[in-house]
Amino acid sequence: MILLFGCAGSPVRTGWEAETNRANMLNLKIGMSKSQVLALMGSPYKTESYQIDGKNLEFWLYLTEGRGIYDRTLRDSNFTPLAFENDVLLGWGRNYYENKLRIEQDIKIEKR
């Protein structure tokens, strides 16, 4: 008798995907095009887009930390964002993501 169990979304599956993505990220280079990143990394788990001051900022988020056995959902900390501006890779990582959004969305207050 052979039993087959699906593992999509399981801790084993997310762990394998995270490990693969981390290994692929070692080959990322600033200035790569979206198509080059897509060829290296595959499709992102999810994306975010922002239009700020005429700039098209896009973040591709890749799973880089697997889900624990008792975790039912994935958290932001499970993903590493890759930042693109006008289809060119600017940088990656959670700190880069948070700093880029904070800088780009900074409210400018005029002096009186």
Name what the model sees in each region.
Residues L3-G6:
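C-terminal motif of bacterial Sec signal peptides marking the signal peptidase cleavage site
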Residues A8-R112:
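Residues within mature, well-folded domains
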